[in-house]
């Protein structure tokens, strides 16, 4: 039984978002639809989810004392992390004191960095992964590359959106790759993972929901990556029945091992009928923004329904759909979007995130489209993006 109070009243049900970006914004909107009181927290003011929250706070979420203070002040019933860069030791302490961390503090801690989740998947669960080594100094980094071999990929153990990642083809790139990885970590310089390159036909995100009525799967989401970040995603990604079954088995093992209720973005490589585990996020996934147009329940609605203890039931997928990101490069604290009217139309939507500023390249929005097939949907989404002019 789920009892929900009314926002801004004594019996209000309160949800605190740790991270208030575009994904958190959609989670906040789903909470608002249920009359839930929303508190958004991030490291900078006027973050997207703060626009649709009842209150907001600006703190360094890696500062355990500051994190504990804001949680103690607001007394949320549900603490919902949106990003990895959080003082997860503090979350475990707070969970031990009776607070509800979504999906659970252990999941946020294990997935905060690539080492925790890789060791769980490969060494504890025995799931197929790429070859890998970890390194915490430049010397051990060279040893790790020698063990894995060329070509390989180096990533900070904690980073997002491709920051700090390099594709290494030769020894001449090692010094630059190490330095770039040290600059790109979400918690500053430190440990890296060196991964062997996996041969694959395509990558998918299998959005997997762990709820009171069991584990549920969305149709697989295909996506194209560039510079470590996604550019387009589409649903459904066509794959063999055997590969889909194996992907679902891997995802089920991972989410049940992590524990708790919520939506998980399980990233997988697919080569023919073979499936290899890549990463998992215990929260909605950026490639899953396509579900805003492709499903009756978006990944955000599913996440909220699951962590509130409600059954998910069946997930209806409407048909071929795609997303394409609006990713301008400029510097401005007063961004405007021109020609949006030419981008939207029947079966085409535009979502602008409301980020307060840009300094370089930043994802500021997404176009969503349906089509007769995924190829057409991707073309329509990309065409919509091309029609939007970002100014500053």
Curated annotation (Swiss-Prot):
Q: Which Gene3D superfamilies match?
A: 3.40.50.20, ATP-grasp fold, A domain (3.30.1490.20), ATP-grasp fold, B domain (3.30.470.20)
Q: What's the EC number here? A: 6.3.1.21
Q: Which pathway features in its UniProt record?
A: Purine metabolism; IMP biosynthesis via de novo pathway; N(2)-formyl-N(1)-(5-phospho-D-ribosyl)glycinamide from N(1)-(5-phospho-D-ribosyl)glycinamide (formate route): step 1/1
Binding of ATP, residues: 114, 155, 160-165, 195-198, 203
Q: Can you tell which superkingdom this protein's organism belongs to?
A: Bacteria
Q: Give the transmembrane ranges.
A: none
- Does Manganese count among this protein's keywords? no
The enzyme's first-digit EC class, named in words, is ligase
Give the UniProt record's GO annotations in the biological process aspect: 'de novo' IMP biosynthetic process
Sequence ranges assigned to domain ATP-grasp in this UniProt record: 119-308
Which residues does N(1)-(5-phospho-beta-D-ribosyl)glycinamide bind? 22-23, 82, 286, 355, 362-363
Where on this chain does Mg(2+) bind? 267, 279
Cellular-component GO terms for this entry = cytosol
SUPFAM superfamilies named in the record: Glutathione synthetase ATP-binding domain-like, PreATP-grasp domain, Rudiment single hybrid motif
Keywords of the record: ATP-binding, Ligase, Magnesium, Metal-binding, Nucleotide-binding, Purine biosynthesis
One short Pfam name that applies is RS_preATP-grasp-like
One GO MF term:
magnesium ion binding
Q: List the disulfide bonds.
A: none
Reactions catalysed, as given in the entry:
N(1)-(5-phospho-beta-D-ribosyl)glycinamide + formate + ATP = N(2)-formyl-N(1)-(5-phospho-beta-D-ribosyl)glycinamide + ADP + phosphate + H(+)
**Quaternary assembly:** Homodimer.
Q: What does this protein do?
A: Involved in the de novo purine biosynthesis. Catalyzes the transfer of formate to 5-phospho-ribosyl-glycinamide (GAR), producing 5-phospho-ribosyl-N-formylglycinamide (FGAR). Formate is provided by PurU via hydrolysis of 10-formyl-tetrahydrofolate.
Q: Which PANTHER family match?
A: FORMATE-DEPENDENT PHOSPHORIBOSYLGLYCINAMIDE FORMYLTRANSFERASE (PTHR43055:SF1)
Record family assignment: Belongs to the PurK/PurT family.
Descriptive protein name: Formate-dependent phosphoribosylglycinamide formyltransferase
This chain's source organism reads Salmonella typhimurium (strain LT2 / SGSC1412 / ATCC 700720)
The major lineage groups are: Bacteria, Pseudomonadati, Pseudomonadota, Gammaproteobacteria, Enterobacterales
Gene symbol? purT
